[in-house]
């Protein structure tokens, strides 16, 4: 076979649609993320928390703190039929094209989108991969593509529960690691999501499991189970998608990287979360050491819920070490530690009191339920107030993250 012929074949392969497609994606190179044109990419992102995984504290609820418990509150207030309408409007209003446009204008270059697996299966038959989640992700990814924001998709609540707390919408135990059925469903959902976005470069990567294995549980028992589950999910994704980066979070709230061996895929990145600590070099040294040891990208995928001064100090430390970041959260009720604060509606305290009162018996539910007029007023106003046009921006929060200079 002649040299000219081999060169011709090589040029043909390099010019093929597949090669062209792969060159459109952010990839990894050593410790860095690289843009399609080969430039280093430092992620400056925002978590769209409370949209597809509601959390009680962002509603000002205390005991109703997981999606299931919050859904129960709304069901008990208005019934299942009206509740379905409430959640549809909630998801349509909470994150819109205007929100994505704002984030880009503020100076962010990426968003992390936490999602609940229940939005990706049939409520009647969990083996059917049908649900509103696919359309919701497709819509927001298209907005991000139009605005020029990268997207990291985050399975915040996995089948069976990967954390064993309110944030994973579980029943208080990380059953995922003991259930083959839950693991298989997790793989299938990720496969379908990966199939959907396999050729979409706006999606930067997949954050497989948010904050697996809470500190409440026996780490010696659970931690050895984590990487095998990750390997199973990655293997499933790679059957349909070899383009995207896969993010692995450590055990114990994404903080413990000792569970990891050497990287087992050529497009792996590792993500840590860190809240409520004294900001200094020592606090992040283990993640820097891990990055150096394995020559892989490391990304700070969540932090926040603190003072503006603390946020600024932490963000500066991360940037000093070329660590990309994604702070938490974008929007919540009546708060300063977010980009956009939702104004508390009139009569909202009636809803909050109902959510916080004992409701373990039908009698307690009846006694706690506010008047129908107050319920309707509060929920209706809430659905209007979550629209960006009705929110207020927190200038101190934006300044702390070094963004927002384009907004007067």
Regions found by a protein language model. Name each.
Residues 1-2:
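N-terminal secretory signal peptides that target proteins for export/translocation
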Residues 28-43, 48-245, 250-258:
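Active-site mouth of glycoside hydrolases
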Residues 14, 151-152, 299:
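Conserved Rossmann-like nucleotide-binding pocket used by diverse enzymes
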Residues 19-21:
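Boundary at the C-terminal end of the N-terminal hydrophobic targeting segment
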Residues 310-408:
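Aromatic-rich peripheral "rim/lid" segments of glycoside hydrolase catalytic domains that contact
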Residues 5-15:
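Sec-dependent N-terminal signal peptides
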Residues 25-26, 184-332, 337-355:
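Extracellular glycoside hydrolase catalytic/binding regions
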